[in-house]
């Protein structure tokens, strides 16, 4: 398949060879065969060959050479959100929604919940992710994370589909416990009834915490905080803020962010990550996902 050629799979999925840089918040990444799947039937076909799932493209560094696997994007029915309260599961204090697709953009979902006065997920405001990816890594901030508002998860793999509750998963800080290779296709949310004003006030707190973050193209935080210590503070103390390699730089505003100055390569990013690990005095666990994975 040549670049930008469009075909249709046997189930009607749109298949196109595209540069992955256009789908990532870093703006880096070579070409791959991208499958846009609208429903479970198309997804099942896409899973017949080696694959990767691409959501909002944050927390991701893709190699300049791209990846050989199919790259799957959830669209159509798998990017729709039914926020209608389930009358059998909701109460005067809580709401359990209908199904929310893994391809739903998280920022738009948070805005809808705020207008409805539904609380529990406002701490994730500003995270440029889709619901499936945000759930898969339990994205969040100091003010809240995705598992604060989950009732049921629908996950799919080549072996089939199953529904699980958060209690069935070994989830924690920036991890869901969902096995690698499984796709978060849909979730049902469990939310607390509040008011639009109260939810907006909590969103403002999380927004304020982001004021010191860079505005340039970035995957987000590079490393998880080790043992409750700020990774950004450790990088700052190592004197690395503002360090540049090629067209990538450790952000002057916040040491735990790497930014694309324009035309950065994945090699630039990897070189900065290696430099940080060499200079910081404690082991750092990467928060980014690397495509392909590094040995």
From Swiss-Prot:
Pfam families: FAD_binding_4 (PF01565), MurB_C (PF02873). It is an enzyme of class 1 (oxidoreductase). It is found in: Cytoplasm. It catalyses: UDP-N-acetyl-alpha-D-muramate + NADP(+) = UDP-N-acetyl-3-O-(1-carboxyvinyl)-alpha-D-glucosamine + NADPH + H(+). The keyword GTP-binding does not apply. One of its GO terms (molecular function) is FAD binding. Keywords: Cell cycle, Cell division, Cell shape, Cell wall biogenesis/degradation, Cytoplasm, FAD, Flavoprotein, NADP, Oxidoreductase, Peptidoglycan synthesis. Its cofactor is FAD. Pathway: Cell wall biogenesis; peptidoglycan biosynthesis. PROSITE patterns: FAD_PCMH. The active site is at 174, 221 (proton donor), 287. InterPro entries: FAD-bd_PCMH (IPR016166), FAD-bd_PCMH-like_sf (IPR036318), FAD-bd_PCMH_sub1 (IPR016167), FAD-bd_PCMH_sub2 (IPR016169), MurB (IPR003170), MurB_C (IPR011601), MurB_C_sf (IPR036635), Oxid_FAD_bind_N (IPR006094). One of its GO terms (cellular component) is cytosol. Gene3D superfamilies: 3.30.465.10, UDP-N-acetylenolpyruvoylglucosamine reductase, C-terminal domain, Uridine Diphospho-n-acetylenolpyruvylglucosamine Reductase, domain 2. Cell wall formation. Belongs to the MurB family. This is UDP-N-acetylenolpyruvoylglucosamine reductase. It comes from Deinococcus geothermalis (strain DSM 11300 / CIP 105573 / AG-3a).
């Amino acid at each position: 398949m040549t670049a930008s050629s469009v075909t249709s799979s046997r189930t009607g999925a749109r298949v196109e060879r595209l540069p992955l840089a256009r789908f990532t918040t870093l703006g880096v990444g070579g070409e791959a065969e991208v499958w846009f799947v609208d429903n479970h039937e198309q997804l099942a076909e896409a899973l017949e060959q080696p694959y990767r799932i691409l959501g909002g493209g944050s927390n991701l560094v893709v190699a300049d050479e791209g990846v050989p696997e199919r790259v799957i994007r959830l669209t159509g029915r798998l990017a729709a959100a039914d926020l209608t309260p389930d009358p059998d599961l909701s109460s005067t204090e809580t709401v359990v929604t209908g199904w929310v697709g893994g391809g739903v953009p998280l920022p738009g979902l948070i805005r809808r919940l705020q207008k409805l006065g539904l609380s529990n997920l406002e701490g994730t405001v500003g995270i440029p992710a889709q619901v499936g990816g945000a759930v898969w890594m339990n994205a969040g901030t100091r003010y809240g994370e995705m598992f604060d508002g989950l009732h049921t998860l629908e996950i799919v793999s080549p072996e089939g589909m199953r529904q699980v509750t958060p209690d069935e998963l070994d989830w924690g800080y920036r991890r869901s416990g969902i096995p690698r290779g499984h796709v978060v296709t849909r979730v049902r949310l469990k939310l607390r009834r509040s008011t639009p004003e109260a939810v907006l006030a909590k969103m403002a707190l999380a927004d304020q915490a982001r004021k010191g973050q860079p505005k340039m193209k970035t995957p987000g935080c590079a490393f998880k905080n080790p043992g409750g210590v700020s990774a950004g503070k450790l990088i700052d103390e190592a004197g690395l803020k503002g360090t540049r390699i090629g067209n990538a730089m450790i952000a002057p505003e916040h040491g735990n962010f790497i930014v694309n100055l324009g035309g950065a390569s994945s090699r630039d990013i990897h070189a900065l990550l290696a430099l940080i690990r060499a200079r910081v005095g404690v082991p750092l666990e990467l928060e980014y996902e690397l495509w392909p994975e590094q040995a």
